[in-house]
Amino acid sequence: MSSHPRPSPRRIRRFGAASIALGVLGTAAQAIGNIQKIQTFVTDVIGSKAFKNLHLALTAVVVAALILAYAAATYWIYLKLQSRDIRIRIAVMALALVLLSGLAVGSYALIPPPPDPDAYRAEKAKEWRDRLLAHPAEDGGVKVSFSEAQAPTQVWTTAQALRAVLVSSVDADLKRLAARLRSAFDFIEDSQIRAAPGGWGYFKEWQTGVTEIAGWVCVAEAASVDATRRDIVWAPEQVSRIFDRITHVVQLIVSTQQHDGGWGPTAQRGADLSRTYSTTLATWCLIEAHRTGGTPLIPDSTYDRAITDGITWLLTNYRQSLGWVPNPHRKIQNERFLGLTAQVLYVLEQAQTSEHFKSVATGPNALPAKKEFLAAPDFGSRSLGDNDRLHDSDRYLRIVSPPVSTPASCTCPPFTIEASTFLWYPWSLAAVRSLAFDQTIEATQRAAAENLSRALTGRLSEASELIDTGFNYIVAEFLIGVSENRPPNASRDRGKT
């Protein structure tokens, strides 16, 4: 008999119940922590960095709770067997130790890993895809805002949403959303300006075509006929019609290129009318359309000349220490447009994946631009809502009458450009994810791009406040940014239909 007084049966029962409760609590805590939706919710509420710290603290608490619980359970079993034969006690205690040790090891193994930024990114991408197409308007278009019931539909927003949904979706999503996607494309087709030279205005009733809107329409249509998607989005008999639409947009874009190689916001041609955003979207359109291989009416020579001239204009108008600015013709400037610079670099990276345009995309100013961008000091501290807007003086197009002997490209009324906001976060994320695979830069710079990609992805939870303003263009551009994931040594050249 033991020399120690044996606790009362009631005390032993209470001790056993407490041990079991503690073990259940620890196990429940780890099970709950392993649910991705709960992790996503917590990340939304407190942010990725705070959640990582919380995870470390909770892991320590859970481990301590499990150790105490299983130690207490072992001691409880010992107390219950205190009066039994020594051989029985030894056998039962040995079995209990084996079982409890196994449970302890298993429980430790089940402790959830730290929050995964890529898993969170995938969750947000799905949420944003569904949000963009959740409430289609009667005309099939996407409204400028998801928070205002009376918000108008807009081709610009619709095209951005289509591109975003298409490049971010897996097959199951595309099948589920295919009908809505087709309806949105029909809205774009029905909203064209019928008078020459055509195109799309800021809203349906606006009769001046805008280059960047045509560019977005083009990259959306090109995404829909990508070889991995076309059979899901379109019926076989519809595919040729979509290629005809792409051909029409390409012809429009090519016909409105300025003599200096850039593009202006409208079809009007004239000195100093080229703008960076217009040129970026027009060049991107041509790159994506060329890649589809489904526009035989547009010869390679036309693509080569237009894209080469567009890229050359962009690289020529890069400004050291500033990057790209919306209107390079304004002489004295000291404002950095990080979002615009990131988007230009992203488009140059797309050009670089094609053997047709690799040499021009890596021409003068390309490497300095990439190096300066990767060295930008404010990626970690800049608020996601701290975005640059077009300067007031850059919104007004100066109308210059062409010489009598020079045919005008269109009869264009005075025009005011929309005061666009250039979102820095999504395009910076897209750019660094591409730069991480760029073989034209040094290995240390690729590593820096990879580190920036992880750091920016870790800040994705900060997007909620900006997303919740309700503007669908923000949702679309963020969705494009988080969906860029170019494989190593990607070489995407002209495909086959």
Model regions and ranges:
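Hydrophobic, helix-forming membrane-interacting segments
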Residues: 2-82, 89-110
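Ser/Thr/Pro/Gly-rich low-complexity linker/stalk segments immediately outside membranes or between
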Residues: 41-45, 108-130, 134
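An alpha-helical repeat/solenoid feature that recognizes helix-turn-helix modules
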Residues: 95-98, 112-119, 145-177, 194-244, ...
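Buried hydrophobic core positions in alpha-solenoid tandem helical repeats
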Residues: 128-132, 184, 188-189, 250-254, ...
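Alpha-helical repeat scaffolds
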Residues: 304, 364-377, 449, 453
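Short, solvent-exposed mixed-charge patches
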Residues: 494-497
